[in-house]
Every structure is written in structure tokens, then in C-alpha cells.
Regions:
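Short, histidine-centered active-site or binding-site loop motifs used for metal coordination
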Residues: 83, 115-117, 246, 280
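Core alpha/beta nucleotide-donor-binding catalytic domains of modification enzymes
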Residues: 2-110, 117-129
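S-adenosyl-L-methionine-dependent DNA methyltransferase catalytic core
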Residues: 1-30, 66, 134-146, 156, ...
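Short, solvent-exposed coil/turn elements at secondary-structure transition points
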Residues: 57-62, 148-150, 273
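Conserved Class I SAM-dependent methyltransferase catalytic core
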Residues: 94-157, 161-166
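Conserved short-loop catalytic and cofactor-binding motifs
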Residues: 87, 116-119, 151, 255, ...
Length: 332
């Protein structure tokens, strides 16, 4: 059986499946997913055909199938600036301990965790220290790094910490976060302006007000105008990090309109084949909660390379053993 067909993974706090996509591309098999949000589940089912289990806190670890890799973009609101950085004082922050109990029971070969970069500094670094200690106590050798979606060809400044761990120390030593940065291009994710529905555009009055407010600023196209609640506007060639709240109202393509659902998915690196089955408002929330797919793809491919080389190495050792001792038996 090919290695990819034998590798199984679980997708915790799955959202709309952004972390899963690169592992599906590798041919790995998802044997369990968990997501409690009904609309996210609707999107997940439409795109992957699997029905996620509900609230992970109510699922016994022994009811989760055996797996080789655990994936989890565990809830980040408790650690984010927008979420007031409550950390483990927020029930969403304690979701890490759900991961811990599953790891303790199943001991998968590898783990990939994703969260906001503020996780590393929350409570003066103590929260992150606890997480690393727990993973170490479970036998995982961990590496981590803050990565930016901009460096993966996406016109979105989205910084996230990626944590990768292996039970095998030698596997961990082989892993690194080295990658070749890619240029981003805002135009590449924008839809044809002639096909944008009229309700995505601001009124002429509001658009003129923005033009007047930015009369002293250099304007270029395409661009994203970032307008804060005070009305201050920054004009950039990329978007700030997509969020789940109302901030999408202040991300304006060329200062004229909001991003479309397809553009929001493209900002996260989702393929155009990805189905949209919920409202525009829901897609805004779901993409704000999701991940930069190309970022995860880079990490997934590195994990795959290590597991594949290990499998090939084991096969080579077995073959050498047979050749060596087989000859001795024959000569005897």
C-alpha cells in the first residue's frame, strides 16, 4: 500500500477545512473531524463530503479513530488582540487541553497546530510555555515559527504561529520552516469588476467623502483601503488580516467596495473550486476564522517528506536485512 494511502489524520476545530486541504492533496485520509458551528459544518460538508462531529469537549478520546497526524487550528479568539487576550481564562483558550487529552490517548506520529502570533506573548509568555511543556511531557519534540501569509503569495498580512511536533526526535530534527518566499499580487485575487453586484459598492456620497478624506494620499490601483472607526484611511497593496467581526466593512477594494465571498476565499488561498453554500455574511465570518492554505501546504509537504523518507528508509533497511541474512542462510 502506498504511504499516502496509509497515513490517517484528524481535523480538530475544523472550521471550513483550510488546514485539511493540503493533506487531502497529499492523498492522506481524514478519519475524523470536529466542528461545532452549524454554518461552518454546512460549508465543510459541501466541500469534503464528511459530516464533522460536534463539540469536541463532549467526545470521548476512545471514540476517535486511530490516526497518524493530528491537525488543529484551535480557537484563537482567547489569545488574539481582538479577543481581549483572555487566554486560558476564556473557555475557548482551554480548548488546547482537549488536544492534550486526545494526544495522550492516541499518540499520533505528528501534530500540526495553528494559532494567532499573540499566543507566544500572552501572559508574558506563560501560556505558550504551558503548551510547550504539555507537549513535551507527552513525548513530542516541537518546533514553531510565526509565519506571514504575505510571504506565501497571498495579498493579506496574516501572521500566525505554526507548531509542528513529532514523537520521533530524529523526525523533528529533520523538520524546518525554510521556504522560498513568493511575491503577492492583489490583482490576482480580484474578480472582474463588471461582474460585481451593485450592493457591494458604497454609495456615491460615501465614496466621494473617502476621496476627499484621502486627497493628500497617493492613490494606486488596485489597492485596499483600510478604514478604521475614526475614519482614518490607509491605502495599501494588500489586505490586513481577515477577521470574524465587522472589520470587513472597512476593507475596501480601491476605496469603493467590499470584497466578494470568492475574493475573501482567494485571500486565504482557497481554490476556486471551493463551494460557497452560505450567505455572504457567513463567508466573511468563516474566512476570518480560517487559515492561509498555502502556508499550511508548505508545512504539510515538509511533514510528508519526512514521513515518506522514513518509510523508504525502513523499506531499504528491511531489504538490506533480507539480502544479507538471506545469503547466509543459502550459503549454510
Amino acid at each position: 500500500m502506498p504511504l499516502t494511502e496509509s497515513i490517517k489524520f484528524i481535523d480538530l476545530f475544523a472550521g471550513i477545512g483550510g488546514i485539511r486541504i493540503p493533506f487531502d492533496e497529499l492523498g492522506y485520509k481524514c478519519v475524523f473531524s470536529s466542528e461545532w458551528d452549524k454554518n461552518a459544518c454546512k460549508t465543510y460538508i459541501a466541500n469534503f463530503g464528511d459530516i464533522p462531529a460536534g463539540d469536541i469537549t463532549k467526545i470521548k478520546e476512545q471514540d476517535i479513530p486511530p490516526h497518524d497526524i493530528l491537525l488543529a487550528g484551535f480557537p484563537c479568539q482567547a489569545f488574539s488582540i481582538m479577543g481581549k487576550m483572555q487566554g486560558f481564562n476564556d473557555t475557548r483558550g482551554t480548548m488546547f487541553f482537549e488536544i492534550e487529552r486526545i494526544l495522550a490517548y492516541h499518540k499520533p506520529k505528528a501534530i500540526l497546530l495553528e494559532n494567532v502570533k499573540q499566543l507566544t506573548t500572552h501572559d508574558h509568555g506563560n501560556t505558550f510555555k504551558v503548551i510547550l511543556q504539555k507537549l513535551s511531557q507527552l513525548g513530542y519534540h516541537v518546533k514553531y515559527q510565526v509565519l506571514n501569509a504575505l510571504d506565501f503569495g497571498l495579498p493579506q498580512k496574516r501572521e500566525r504561529i505554526i507548531i509542528v511536533g513529532f514523537l520521533d526526535k530524529f523526525d523533528s530534527e529533520k523538520f524546518n520552516f525554510d521556504f522560498e518566499k513568493k511575491d503577492y499580487n492583489l490583482a490576482s485575487i480580484l474578480e472582474d469588476e463588471t461582474k460585481i453586484p451593485a450592493n457591494f459598492y458604497a454609495s456615491e456620497k460615501i465614496r466621494q467623502k473617502r476621496l476627499d478624506f484621502t486627497s493628500d494620499k497617493i492613490k494606486f490601483f488596485p489597492s485596499v483601503w483600510h478604514e478604521n472607526k475614526s475614519g482614518n484611511i490607509s491605502i495599501l497593496d494588500y489586505s490586513c488580516a481577515l477577521r470574524t467581526g465587522a472589520s470587513y466593512n472597512y476593507l475596501l477594494v480601491n476605496g469603493e467596495r467590499r470584497f466578494t465571498p470568492r475574493e475573501l476565499l482567494r485571500l486565504q488561498g482557497f481554490p476556486d473550486s471551493y463551494k460557497i453554500v452560505v450567505s455572504t455574511q457567513e463567508i466573511r465570518r468563516q474566512t476570518g476564522n480560517s487559515v492561509a492554505v498555502p502556508m499550511i501546504r508548505m508545512v504539510a509537504q515538509k511533514i510528508d517528506s519526512i514521513l515518506r523518507s522514513k518509510e523508504n528508509g525502513a523499506t531499504s533497511e528491511t531489504q538490506r536485512f533480507k539480502e544479507t541474512y538471506g545469503k547466509r542462510v543459502i550459503s549454510a
